[in-house]
From Swiss-Prot:
Family: Belongs to the TRAFAC class TrmE-Era-EngA-EngB-Septin-like GTPase superfamily. Era GTPase family.
Positions of the Era-type G domain: 4-171
Chief localization: cytoplasm
GO cellular component, one term: plasma membrane
Taxon lineage: Bacteria, Bacillati, Bacillota, Clostridia, Peptostreptococcales
Protein name (database record): GTPase Era
Keywords: Cell membrane, Cytoplasm, GTP-binding, Membrane, Nucleotide-binding, Ribosome biogenesis, RNA-binding, rRNA-binding
Domain KH type-2: 202-280
């Protein structure tokens, strides 16, 4: 039996369920999930292995019109990834006709020779008539080799999606060990978990003005405890107070929720300290972006 392997990227407008889809396939929380757009900032590499194939998923930031240096970085990562892969999955939301955001992305795709699948997400929320209409609209573009409706949250049709991806992969080597699910360092995953909790707890105007850096992560000698310090950067002094909350309650809530997920990730008890620092306009400062892992 021949072994197949290759690289797949998931693209789409911000917040259509790209991270949810990848986490559903891999079976672990690898990419940050939030109800706020543009939550994926780094190219997350995840691995799905079976006996006769291996798929390496690159979950990129949503393609959008950038407003600052961080936004430019996010869009550049997404565009560059299209050139590196064997299959592109274009994920769209349920019940929405082709809007300006989708047209903008398809403009970026029209000269790409990589096989492309249209993945219609959240079919659990739409009826067959709407689904047929959405399929027809995208089929008319002639961009897609496959159109596959799914529910990333509930896992509907994920098996079909995997089979179709594998059918387009070339024969190739096993790039990663079969038990490996991500190449992301634990420090980055810890920072992403903290940022996810901040996105959940904070008001709409603040989340994309924050970043999280794991400044210290150390196993206690002869103990099943990991000490972690994470620094939360925000752009305004007023935001620092909002993040901390009255009597520190909001930051404590973020810390408690993050600690529980980090303990699941590491399989150890965790002592987590969170610090909040003001760094004005960090999203436009190349030095700061580089220190936070944005090349």
């Amino acid at each position: 039996m021949s072994y197949k392997s290759g690289f797949v990227t998931i693209i789409g407008r911000p917040n259509v369920g790209k991270s949810t889809l990848m986490n559903q396939i891999i079976g672990e929380k690898i990419a940050i999930m939030s109800d706020k757009p543009q939550t994926t900032r780094n190219k997350i590499q995840s691995v799905y292995s079976q006996e006769d194939f291996q798929i390496v998923f690159l979950d990129t930031p949503g393609i959008h019109k950038p407003k600052h240096k961080l936004g430019e970085y996010m869009v550049k990562v997404a565009r560059d990834t299209l050139k590196e892969v064997d299959v592109v999955l274009f994920l769209v939301d349920e019940g929405q006709k082709i809007g300006p955001g989708d047209r903008f992305i398809m403009e970026q795709l029209k000269d790409i020779k990589t096989p492309m699948f249209l993945i219609i997400n959240k079919i659990d929320k739409m009826n067959q008539e709407i689904l047929n209409e959405v399929c027809g609209l995208f089929e008319e573009t002639g961009l897609f080799q496959r159109i596959i409706p799914i529910s990333a949250l509930e896992g509907a049709n994920i098996d079909t999606l995997i089979k179709q991806i594998v059918s387009f992969l070339p024969e190739g080597p096993q790039y990663f060990p079969s038990d490996m699910i991500t190449d992301q360092p634990e420090r980055l995953l810890v920072a992403e978990i903290v940022r996810e909790k901040l996105l959940h707890y904070l008001d709409q105007e603040i989340p994309h003005g924050i970043a999280v850096e794991t400044s210290m992560m150390k196993q206690r000698p002869n103990q099943d405890i990991v000490d972690i310090q994470a620094t939360i950067y925000c752009e305004k002094k007023s935001h620092k107070g909002i993040i901390i909350g009255k009597g520190g309650r909001k930051l404590k809530g973020v810390g408690k929720s993050a600690r529980q997920d980090i303990e699941k990730l590491l399989g150890s008890k965790v002592f987590l300290e969170l610090w909040v620092k003001v760094n004005e306009d960090w999203r436009n400062q190349s030095r700061i972006l580089k220190s936070l892992g944005y090349e």
